[in-house]
Amino acid sequence: LTLPIGRAMCLGKVLRVGVKGLTGGHSGVEINKGRANANKVLAQTLRGLPLRLISIDGGSKDNAIPRASEAYLVSEDPKLPTMLKERWDAVRAALPTGETTVEFYCEEAQSDLLPMDWESSAYALELLNELPNGVQAMSADIEGLVQTSLNLGILETRADDVRMTFSVRSSVNAEKAALIETLRKLGARFGARYDESGEY
């Protein structure tokens, strides 16, 4: 999915905010172990807070569950670091029990890029939060076998868009097609383009 973004000047403090230390793993082999996806965790952390994204990036392979994700953002609200800490506590409590080494961080930073405009920033975070991820269906015939899943493996911000790359897997073609259609329709609601390459 490719989400076009606009950028606009904004006064405020630039911060670098991220999550690291998640377990990660291979999206085909370990998707059923309930491991947290850093891209989804960071988007959940930032949703609805008084900020505008500059960039949000995480992961380098579509078939690997990201262990870390990072955003540069700007905010005029001096209480944002406190709000982030409260949000981290809630997000940490909801993580799978095996995620014991996760770390959240927030520090002052600089960026050469203009922040996204309000709508682009809000759309990016809303879309990231609403996108499905992980196991979608288990096999009815073989106990413990994942039938259909997807993984948001790469999140990349460029000058004019945010690109979200998934690995979609299924042993049932109809389920895979339905899941891809869900991604396409959800992306279209926010003005994102869908394209695909490769097959699993």
Descriptions of predicted regions:
Residues 1-169:
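Midchain, well-structured core segments that form catalytic/ion-binding scaffolds
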